[in-house]
Amino acid sequence: MKTYEDFVRIRGWAHQRNLVSGSTTDKQFLKLIEEVGELAAGLARKDDVKIMDGIGDAVVVLTILAEQLGFSIEACIEMAYDEIKDRKGRMIDGVFVKEADL
């Protein structure tokens, strides 16, 4: 599957089920937190299937949330990448800390 096509399908699925205009950003944010909780449970149990499902579900919810706000998830990802692509920093206790925060 192609990523762009996947996002198109996710948006279509969400519109067909009235999740974009029939839900609120607050509700979608709560759903995102729920999915992140499921991801955390998968990580804690080292369950690859639950981890993949949690990541995928979070991406679906983020795609819907972006659509509700009038953004495309692709534009959000591009903006985030453009912000980090030249970032410098270092690893501290397994976490990358950007130079500005050191």
Protein language model regions, located:
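Flexible "arm" and connector segments at domain edges
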Residues: 1-55, 59-102
